[in-house]
């Protein structure tokens, strides 16, 4: 679920931090820049693990700050495909079941990846597994807040870097706001034995 990623970046340290240890100042600046941010095709950055190399620092004309090229390792949330995770149901919609890990919310289990047969209860706004028994179908509700075990089957990165508006977008900008896309999304599945709500598989 978590991986160590080697990165390189140039860190700017302002003059008023020169009295501090260089490593402490660099660690603080790196965490300010990266913590809780999604790096495209890398994952969600959590925290600095260690600094492996510091190159020479430079002070440029007109800027009293030091600029240091830093090699470091960062803890990143990036689950492997087919990895099993446990989260909590954040909510349900016709699109599927939305799951949260607490620190990461952009997880969707689409209808075709639920235990089958499944239906969406419009009145309750929940997905229901119509579990077949000898006595007939038994409805198992996927309620908000329930713990759920799922398999990661796909991931999607979206480049959300700021770009200038096109002429078509500029014309329609006053009419409607564009839908904000998540920079990193996971797609899950519970369509196999042992997956789904933990309460479904708890032995008495």
Curated annotation (Swiss-Prot):
Transmembrane ranges?
A: none
Entry GO MF terms: DNA binding; DNA-directed RNA polymerase activity
Q: Fetch the InterPro entries from UniProt.
A: NA-bd_OB-fold, RNA_pol_III_Rbc25, RNA_pol_Rpb7-like_N_sf, RNAP_E/RPC8, Rpb7-like, Rpb7-like_N
- What is annotated about its quaternary structure and interactions? Component of the RNA polymerase III complex consisting of 17 subunits: a ten-subunit horseshoe-shaped catalytic core composed of POLR3A/RPC1, POLR3B/RPC2, POLR1C/RPAC1, POLR1D/RPAC2, POLR3K/RPC10, POLR2E/RPABC1, POLR2F/RPABC2, POLR2H/RPABC3, POLR2K/RPABC4 and POLR2L/RPABC5; a mobile stalk composed of two subunits POLR3H/RPC8 and CRCP/RPC9, protruding from the core and functioning primarily in transcription initiation; and additional subunits homologous to general transcription factors of the RNA polymerase II machinery, POLR3C/RPC3-POLR3F/RPC6-POLR3G/RPC7 heterotrimer required for transcription initiation and POLR3D/RPC4-POLR3E/RPC5 heterodimer involved in both transcription initiation and termination.
Superkingdom classification of source: Eukaryota
GO BP terms: namely: defense response to virus; DNA-templated transcription initiation; innate immune response; nucleobase-containing compound metabolic process; transcription by RNA polymerase III
What role is this protein assigned? DNA-dependent RNA polymerase catalyzes the transcription of DNA into RNA using the four ribonucleoside triphosphates as substrates. Specific peripheric component of RNA polymerase III (Pol III) which synthesizes small non-coding RNAs including 5S rRNA, snRNAs, tRNAs and miRNAs from at least 500 distinct genomic loci. With CRCP/RPC9 forms a mobile stalk that protrudes from Pol III core and functions primarily in transcription initiation. Pol III plays a key role in sensing and limiting infection by intracellular bacteria and DNA viruses.
Main localization (coarse): nucleus
Task: Tell me which UniProt keywords the record has, alphabetically.
Answer: Antiviral defense, DNA-directed RNA polymerase, Immunity, Innate immunity, Nucleus, Transcription
Q: Upper taxonomic classification of the species?
A: Eukaryota, Metazoa, Chordata, Craniata, Vertebrata
Q: Which CDD domains match?
A: RNAP_III_Rpc25_N
Protein name per the record: DNA-directed RNA polymerase III subunit RPC8
A GO cellular-component term linked to this record: nucleoplasm
Pfam families given for it? Answer: RNA_pol_Rbc25 (PF08292), SHS2_Rpb7-N (PF03876)
Its annotated compartments are: Nucleus
Q: Which family does it belong to?
A: Belongs to the eukaryotic RPB7/RPC8 RNA polymerase subunit family.
